[in-house]
């Protein structure tokens, strides 16, 4: 038996070598491992020393083997390369299935066979808790105090049979990891190492056993060999030798194909989003409008889109379903590539917002018609693809929400749309006004556009169609004139200007004759009648003028119809075109604002159609003239045949300025021109009322009474003259002419031819007319009246339109003189007498009728004288 002393030197040597070698690999380990690795290294060194001491008990051959083949000690592992599938996590190695991983092995005496001393097991190392110790007795031997055998080595991790050495302290091995079992997401494996050499032979074992048995009393034949007599796998200390195999990260598709799909899905997402905005914004009404009035390209686009857009809910469901499907798929593919949910969400959100929402919607909102028409085939394709899901939902929406009609604008919205889009459309202001006026026609009433009754031009039914009346009608410029009786609100007839085409102003035709002959119907409307209804009435041709009335039920009494004004077709048209229609005769631009028309260069002047001064200005009927003549001759002493011949009276009444008319205005009743006489104001004329009414105020008490036709005033004014003495009529007879008159036989000059014309009687230079010497007494009588002035003590004011006779004192005195000249007998000596009458220039001029009257009288006188001389010569 080999004693232990024989082995002692070798044990010492082995211990010394181990002790000497331990610092070497410890320093190497410290340089490459962490603090935890250094702890594992010290524990491994503590285990090696007992093994080395036990090996000294072996035989000489055993000791020699130990000295020649030193034990390989594995300290730890780490990943050579890290990536997405192989990395360190929490001190453990994390790798993926179906991969090959390179590991760097740290330890002592790393050689080409080291790969065979490494294995992995699925079973975790068992650790005893302190409670497992016996109570009151010695502690049982702890397995953790020495090497602990590892469980069954796994076949899921294969150590490839090669190693790359590096200075015998580290090496690189490669392992292959097989797939995990079904339903396993991850699995943990633990590192196991082999510490003992291969088992010895029988003799060796017996010797060793005998030595040990002899030493310790247990090395007898038949006992099982010690654990280190064969290859023993033990757990490696330290958590850093734990390996976690995770599920292999599988891509749904190859990376390049996924990139293509992601790009395509982004395009589809943008298309669905853009079409959803572009097509759904084109409502069916707008598409119909574009089909009818758009350009050729727009008509083509609308024609292609309209059948699809007509199925609004079906199209909406298809586009939304496709958009959601595309966006969801895009997120899944991005998550598969990124490997992180947060990254996938951020990237997909950015991509969808920019390329799937903002850009396509910005384009389709402006060019939706073109984009929708060019992608109509894709739209139809996806509508067919999503038909099973989208069509039932669309039908449900049709039942719940009803059929889509489209955008419909009412009158107010359409007007506002025109106003808002005015800067962007090509409508001119006049066109826009006409459109607005036509749309507002139903919202306005005739009361808004009518001409109030107080501003209407109207004619009384008692009017006479003389020159003044017809001139007033023509100057008004209206073609349809209401005719009233009594009050202006009592409109009884309607006069058309064309009805006066065959009326002669000289005939003084009564207005009633014309209105009764034509009998134009009156059209009454209520004040709340809309303008569109009024336009329809005017279009029927019944009338282009209507009388606006309302039911007045204010106050006590029964309701009655109150006339408010007049509305015409022109008023309605002006509201439609939002502008005033002006013609040549308009005086105002607006019948409501009363803004006058600007001054026109050409004005209508009807003076060319007036009668001359020699004509009667006011036409009266022959019957009225006869009645007036007989009344003055029989009822008024100043015009009796004893004072004035009937012939001269008739000529006086036919004088143009004798018969006059006065138009009465109800608005200005107290105007001075309506007073024929005023109290305490001198007058020199006589007045006879023919037609109309006057009011007479007489006496200090101011008694008033009304008078009508054939009442006369101012008889005393005919015998009293307010004319100054310088302007009075004077009779001058030259001395030579008086002497010639005294001796008629001496006058041998031929008689002056008769023929005092109009120019001679009114000439400023020739103021003397011939008179006979026998008028001396009359001359004295006339001169005696020059100092008399007539001042009435009463007032006469018109109450209506008047037609009256106005004879001034000058006209009366001329008529008296003409009458006396007509009555005075002519002598034979008057043929050589020249009598000239000086007349002042009257304020209204000497009438031609008086001059003709004097000419006729002189002609008669001279003809008688010539006739007597002719008879004497014959004798």
Swiss-Prot record:
CDD domains: CBS_pair_CorC_HlyC_assoc. It is found in: Cell membrane. Changing residue 357 to K: In HOMGSMR1; results in decreased cellular uptake of magnesium. GO terms for cellular component: basolateral plasma membrane; glutamatergic synapse; plasma membrane. Residues 251-431 form the CNNM transmembrane domain. One of its GO terms (biological process) is magnesium ion homeostasis. Shares weak sequence similarity with the cyclin family, hence its name. However, it has no cyclin-like function in vivo. Divalent metal cation transporter. Mediates transport of divalent metal cations in an order of Mg(2+) > Co(2+) > Mn(2+) > Sr(2+) > Ba(2+) > Cu(2+) > Fe(2+). It is linked to Hypomagnesemia 6: A renal disease characterized by severely lowered serum magnesium levels in the absence of other electrolyte disturbances. Affected individuals show an inappropriately normal urinary magnesium excretion, demonstrating a defect in tubular reabsorption. Age of clinical onset is highly variable and some affected individuals are asymptomatic. Hypomagnesemia, seizures, and impaired intellectual development 1: A disease characterized by renal wasting of magnesium, low serum magnesium, seizures, and variable degrees of delayed psychomotor development. This is Metal transporter CNNM2. It comes from Homo sapiens (Human). The lineage of its organism: Eukaryota, Metazoa, Chordata, Craniata, Vertebrata.
